[in-house]
Amino acid sequence: MVRRQSAPRLEFEAAAIYEYPEHLRPFLSEAPALPGVYIFHSESDTLPLYIGKSVNIRSRVLSHLRTPDEAAMLRQARRISWICTAGEMGALLLEARLIKEQQPLFNKRLRRNRQLCSLQLSEQKIEVVSARSVDFSHEPNLFGLFANRRAALQSLQNLADEQKLCYGLLGLEPVSRGRACFRFALKRCAGACCGQETPQAHFLRLQASLERLRVVCWPWKGAIALKESRPQMTQFHIINNWLWLGAVPSLDEAATLVRTPAGFDQDGYKILCKPLMSGQYEIIELHTDCRQS
């Protein structure tokens, strides 16, 4: 008996059904080879499909049009718009704000995290603190930014496992004074719970291990302006407590943006901390009237 073979199953990969989006070609010809943010729009003007950033808008948009994996988004796109910035920093900041505000269909969602937590070290103890009760922009000795309390505790547990720190002294499990914990018997704890290591030595090891996660306090008295320039365009990014308040073409207009932010902006911190602390940009501290001579 001849076994009947079934027809091979067709795999509709993106590359197999991709067609170059000719309807978007006119927008590509107008796209500038400059830094900024670009937006793919559907027929609806209220819900963008995708928001991205680049130091060269034209080049980046072209790469989207040639990518089969983005066929679904490209088929829905009806037009492309863009906003030019003075440089990469402005593009990063504007992209993050627009994604958070407009929630594009094909972007990873960015939302204000109301459960944001950190680990605070004080008086030889560590505890989880929430951004709802502590100002992360100014509170010292904070380590790590976590989506919630559970994530913070998991990170602390991972650190304890790596460094053979004592769960009991870290508050991760109950401890009986003077008695070795279960992990000590397994050689997973250095013995701070039973006198094999002093509490001070244990604390110093914990402190050293956490240092790479330190949250940097806002180092200025108030708002600052970060200057970013390219030929034919200069922007002053107004920033306070790690929050980007917006950009203006001159310092005389800074007063229209300066305010004290409510809460801590995790996305702003991640974008701004390293560049601001590295000294790679010109920073101007803003006075009360926000005018510079």
Swiss-Prot record:
InterPro entries found in the cross-reference section: GIY-YIG_endonuc (IPR000305), GIY-YIG_endonuc_sf (IPR035901), GIY-YIG_UvrC_Cho (IPR047296), UvrABC_protein_C (IPR050066)
Start and end residues of each GIY-YIG domain: 33-108
Source domain of life: Bacteria
GO cellular component labels: excinuclease repair complex
Biological process, per Gene Ontology: nucleotide-excision repair; SOS response
CDD domains reported for this sequence: GIY-YIG_UvrC_Cho (cd10434)
Keywords: DNA damage, DNA excision, DNA repair, Excision nuclease, Hydrolase, SOS response
Enzyme type, top EC level: hydrolase
EC number: 3.1.25.-
Molecular function via GO: nuclease activity
Role, per record: Incises the DNA at the 3' side of a lesion during nucleotide excision repair. Incises the DNA farther away from the lesion than UvrC. Not able to incise the 5' site of a lesion. When a lesion remains because UvrC is not able to induce the 3' incision, Cho incises the DNA. Then UvrC makes the 5' incision. The combined action of Cho and UvrC broadens the substrate range of nucleotide excision repair.
Record NCBIfam families: PRK10545.1
Name of the featured protein: Excinuclease cho
Gene that this sequence comes from: cho
